[in-house]
Swiss-Prot record:
Molecular-function GO terms, alphabetical: gap junction channel activity
Compartment list: Cell membrane; Cell junction, Gap junction
Gene: GJD2
Residues on Cytoplasmic side: 1-19, 99-197, 276-321
Organism: Homo sapiens
Keyword Transmembrane helix tagged: yes
Domain of life from the UniProt record: Eukaryota
PANTHER family: CONNEXIN, GAP JUNCTION DELTA-2 PROTEIN
Name of the protein in question: Gap junction delta-2 protein
Gene3D superfamilies xref list: Gap junction channel protein cysteine-rich domain
Family (UniProt): Belongs to the connexin family. Delta-type subfamily.
Subunit composition and interactions: A connexon is composed of a hexamer of connexins.
GO cellular component: connexin complex; plasma membrane; synapse
Length: 321
């Protein structure tokens, strides 16, 4: 149960900031109606699945062969595999969003340091210092301020200060550079577009996985679990009758999981409709548009070189005759 709790926390982190309202409803459906029911109820229902699968024969190996024919993969294992695969796109989205947030913090810190480097120490602490009045005092004050900048914060690091010096350094507010603001806004916009594009892509992949597992469940098990299963598979000598434990309970559980998968598919389609099919097309074609824009910018920045026209020579004129 501890592994499922970790998965629930990761899914909650995936939809905490970037998901829509439909995505949060889908998370509730996945967590409550899938993870909790499979982890708590499913293990109890399918605990004696193979041991209680009894066939009316004493032939060695016949029970195991018929069980493998009746259930190529166990219901509970199929649903666990389905939950893991369906949650994989959301986990990939968590990794991508955390990575982008870390990069954004690094850019923000680098912007602060660039702003501090642009302003000289004289403009921060005054033109002539507080006690020197000349070039020597200015140099001492510059050295003092340069030593005081620690992680982008101005601190008074000198322990042996004179009584005439103030306890705190008077610092004026730094005004960010306009080019830095434009660069920061552009990078933030690109980051938001990238996260939105990746979110749409993971919703598309998640819906495709839901539909694939729904179809696979239908072809493997159908909509009911029979109580009596007839088997003539080797090494059975003749056709034998096998009995499945708790067929009605398993049928109800199977139909319930069909309904949950159908609800998840409908919610995924509703979320895609909410995000907009036009945005989805842009997200799918985002890489091509990005390459095209980079190509146009490069062609615009390159200087146009005029090719000199030497005209036709006599030999070239004769060549066209």
């Amino acid at each position: 149960m501890g592994e499922w709790t970790i998965l629930e926390r990761l899914l909650e982190a995936a939809v905490q900031q970037h998901s829509t309202m439909i995505g949060r409803i889908l998370l509730t459906v996945v967590v409550i109606f899938r993870i909790l029911i499979v982890a708590i109820v499913g293990e109890t229902v399918y605990d004696d699945e193979q041991t209680m699968f009894v066939c009316n024969t004493l032939q060695p190996g016949c029970n195991q062969a018929c069980y493998d024919r009746a259930f190529p993969i166990s219901h509970i294992r199929y649903w666990v595999f389905q939950i893991i695969m369906v949650c994989t796109p959301s986990l990939c989205f968590i990794t991508y969003s955390v990575h982008q947030s870390a990069k954004q913090r690094e850019r923000r810190y680098s912007t602060v340091f660039l702003a501090l480097d642009r302003d000289p120490p004289e403009s921060i602490g005054g033109p002539g210092g507080t006690g020197g009045g000349g070039s020597g005092g200015g140099k001492r004050e510059d050295k003092k301020l340069q030593n005081a900048i620690v992680n982008g914060v101005l601190q008074n690091t000198e322990n042996t200060s004179k009584e005439t010096e103030p306890d705190c350094l008077e610092v004026k507010e730094l005004t960010p550079h306009p080019s830095g603001l434009r660069t920061a806004s552009k990078s933030k916009l690109r980051r938001q577009e990238g996260i939105s594009r990746f979110y749409i892509i993971q919703v598309v992949f998640r819906n495709a996985l839901e539909i694939g597992f729904l179809v696979g469940q239908y072809f493997l098990y159908g909509f009911s679990v029979p109580g009596l299963y007839e088997c003539n598979r080797y090494p059975c000598i003749k056709e034998v009758e096998c009995y499945v434990s708790r067929p009605t309970e398993k049928t109800v559980f199977l139909v319930f999981m069909f309904a949950v998968s159908g609800i998840c598919v409908v919610l995924n389609l509703a979320e895609l409709n909410h995000l907009g099919w036009r945005k989805i097309k842009l997200a799918v074609r985002g890489a091509q548009a990005k390459r095209k824009s980079i190509y146009e910018i490069r062609n615009k920045d390159l200087p146009r070189v005029s090719v000199p026209n030497f005209g036709r020579t006599q030999s070239s004129d004769s060549a066209y005759v």
